[in-house]
């Protein structure tokens, strides 16, 4: 039987000897709050299975489950978070033994190790967070699509190398945010499949001699399947790596949006205005309106890459199966998860509240020869010359326009005469008109308003499917949790 203040983990092999600074250094309790709920559910499911398999008495199992539900309702902060107990698993078990006695509560851990327990907890906690991130992504995607629809005919300039390139619409530009975001959604949905597999029953790494039922706990906890190799069950953390890699990719995509919010809201671009609540001012320059939120988000998203590399480095060359090194993955995982969640909310709000300067956008399309490509294309179509030849001719038109401080319309005819080419004035005017440029580009993925409208509807249709899939998963997990709490 447990004595007062006796450490149930160390008492047998190690005795009562502990050193406070070592215990504080080793404990994972500071970040185990992320798996507290999952650990309770894991304990309940495991206990229920032990009862059904007649490994423990039903009356003992019922007492354990009822006490676990009390701990769940009271929360982690009501427990004795003694660092010498290492982690939340032993804290909960110690609390159970204190309240029920070791002869009852000491049976809960039968046929199980902390190794398969924590692996199960992590997967359960992470799947919840993945679904949260997916909900935020889907909501942001819909908001971007709504804004794109509003600006499907709003002319703006497109860039390559951050130089004026060709006219497009702002709606088309916004779809360039929606497109990679859809891939982010698909990656996380696919990753969920590999997160939602159950290691419980793997034991320390070699399963157990007790007649446990792994499929029963899999069903109770809402997993799709079990991990068939017990060594891999406790050792695998690639599901964490995959999730963090996906978050790094997502963060990279989001950082581009932040960068463009900074650029486009500057005086030099002046194409958008950020809402005041997403900016700050200077302590010395009273006129300043700084895009600090976008800058902070851009910086925070960089930490996702650092966290990923840290976890990769921790995992590199670890021997099978469980090593305590794995504990140090968790802070980096949860930091990436919460940085992603917080930043998605911020960026979504920032984009949804921008004010678009359509006049400035249109003005930029009329500068710096952005319609030169269509002029070359027109020469190909109307004069039946090779594109490379047309490219050279229009390049000369641009050069002469710059040298003589003229626009292309004032130079083109002299250059065409030089090459013995004829082109109607109406064709020239159409080729040099930014909106006509845009309207002609109606192939799939193009900036023509009708194509942007089609693309938006296509995105909406797919988003509805993703949203239903995510909501179904959330509903399933909520049912699982309610069922466990009502055992």
Swiss-Prot record:
Where would you say this protein principally sits, based on its record?
Answer: cytoplasm
Q: SUPFAM superfamilies annotated for this entry?
A: L-aspartase-like
Biochemical pathway? Amino-acid biosynthesis; L-arginine biosynthesis; L-arginine from L-ornithine and carbamoyl phosphate: step 3/3
Listed under GO biological process in this entry are: arginine biosynthetic process via ornithine; L-arginine biosynthetic process
One Pfam match, given by its short name, reads Lyase_1
Q: Which reaction does it catalyse?
A: 2-(N(omega)-L-arginino)succinate = fumarate + L-arginine
| Enzyme class (EC, first level) | lyase
Spell out the InterPro entries in the cross-references. Answer: Arg_succ_lyase_C, Argininosuccinate_lyase, Fumarase/histidase_N, Fumarate_lyase_fam, Fumarate_lyase_N, L-Aspartase-like
What is one GO cellular-component annotation here? Answer: cytosol
EC identifiers of the protein: 4.3.2.1
Q: Where in the cell is it found?
A: Cytoplasm
Q: Which UniProt keywords apply?
A: Amino-acid biosynthesis, Arginine biosynthesis, Cytoplasm, Lyase
Q: Which GO-annotated molecular functions does the record name? A: argininosuccinate lyase activity
NCBIfam families linked: argH
Which protein family is named in the record? Belongs to the lyase 1 family. Argininosuccinate lyase subfamily.
HAMAP family recorded: Arg_succ_lyase (MF_00006)
Its protein name is Argininosuccinate lyase
Protein species of origin? Methanococcus aeolicus (strain ATCC BAA-1280 / DSM 17508 / OCM 812 / Nankai-3)
């Amino acid at each position: 039987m447990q004595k007062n203040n006796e450490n149930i983990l160390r008492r047998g092999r190690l005795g009562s000897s502990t050193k406070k600074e070592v215990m504080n250094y080793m404990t994972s309790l500071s970040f185990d709050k992320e798996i507290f709920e999952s650990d309770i559910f894991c304990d309940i499911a495991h206990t229920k299975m032990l009862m059904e398999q007649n490994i423990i008495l039903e009356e003992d199992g019922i007492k354990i489950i009822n006490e676990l539900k009390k701990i769940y309702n009271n929360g982690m902060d009501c427990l004795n978070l003694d660092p010498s107990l290492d982690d939340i698993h032993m804290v909960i078990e110690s609390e159970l033994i204190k309240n029920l006695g070791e002869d009852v509560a000491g049976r809960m851990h039968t046929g199980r190790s902390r190794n398969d327990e924590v692996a199960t907890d992590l997967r359960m906690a992470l799947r919840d967070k993945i679904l949260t991130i997916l909900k935020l992504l889907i909501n942001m995607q819909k908001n971007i699509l709504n804004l794109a629809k509003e600006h499907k005919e709003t002319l703006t300039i497109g860039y390559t190398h951050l130089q004026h390139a060709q006219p497009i619409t702002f709606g088309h530009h916004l779809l360039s945010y929606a497109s990679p975001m859809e891939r982010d959604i698909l990656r996380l949905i696919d990753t969920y499949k590999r997160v939602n597999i159950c290691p419980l029953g793997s034991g320390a790494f070699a399963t157990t001699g007790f007649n446990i039922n792994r499929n029963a706990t899999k069903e109770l906890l809402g997993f799709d399947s079990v991990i068939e190799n017990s060594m891999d069950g406790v050792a695998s953390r690639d599901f964490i790596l995959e999730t963090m890699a996906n978050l790094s990719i997502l963060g990279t995509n989001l950082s581009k949006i932040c960068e463009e919010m900074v650029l486009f809201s500057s005086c030099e671009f002046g194409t958008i205005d950020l809402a005041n609540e997403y900016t700050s001012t200077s302590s010395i320059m009273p006129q300043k309106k700084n895009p600090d939120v976008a800058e902070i988000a851009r910086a925070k998203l960089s930490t996702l890459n650092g966290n990923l590399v840290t976890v990769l480095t921790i995992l590199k060359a670890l021997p099978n199966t469980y090593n305590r090194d794995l504990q140090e993955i968790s802070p980096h995982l949860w930091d990436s998860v919460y940085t992603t969640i917080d930043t998605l909310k911020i960026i979504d709000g920032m984009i949804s509240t921008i004010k678009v300067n359509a006049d400035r956008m249109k003005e930029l399309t009329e500068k710096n020869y952005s319609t030169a490509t269509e002029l070359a294309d027109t020469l190909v179509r109307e004069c039946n010359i090779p594109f490379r030849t047309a490219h050279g001719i229009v390049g000369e038109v641009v050069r002469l326009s710059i040298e003589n401080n003229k626009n292309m319309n004032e130079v083109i005819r002299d250059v065409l005469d030089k090459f013995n080419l004829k082109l109607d004035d109406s064709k020239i005017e159409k080729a040099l008109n930014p909106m006509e440029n845009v309207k002609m580009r109606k192939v799939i993925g193009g900036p023509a308003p009708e194509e942007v409208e089609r693309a938006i509807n296509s995105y909406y249709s797919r988003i509805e499917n993703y949203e239903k899939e995510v909501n179904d998963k959330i509903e399933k997990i909520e049912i699982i949790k309610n069922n466990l709490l009502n055992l």
